[in-house]
Amino acid sequence: MNYVYLLRCADGSLYCGWTTDLEARLAAHNSGRGAKCTRSRLPVELVYTEAYEDRHDALSREWHIKRMSHAEKERLIGSK
C-alpha cells in the first residue's frame, strides 16, 4: 500500500509526504532522520492519511496536496 500523509510540526506547520510504511516513516521523522523540513520542527504528529494501491496515484496526490495553501490543507484534515 502507498500512503500520502500530512504531519503537523511543533511550530504548527504542515508537511506532506509519501511512503509505503507509515509507522516507520513517522518514527524516522520524529527521530530526526526524516525530511530536512521536519528535523528542526520536532515533534511531529500524523494528522491525515490517504491510501492508494498504485504508487503513481499516491505520488500524484502528494504533488497536488503540496501545492495547496495551509488553509486548504487544514480543510482537508478537517474533512476526515
Across the structure, where does each feature detected by a protein language model lie?
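GIY-YIG nuclease catalytic motif and its immediate N-terminal context
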Residues: 1-80
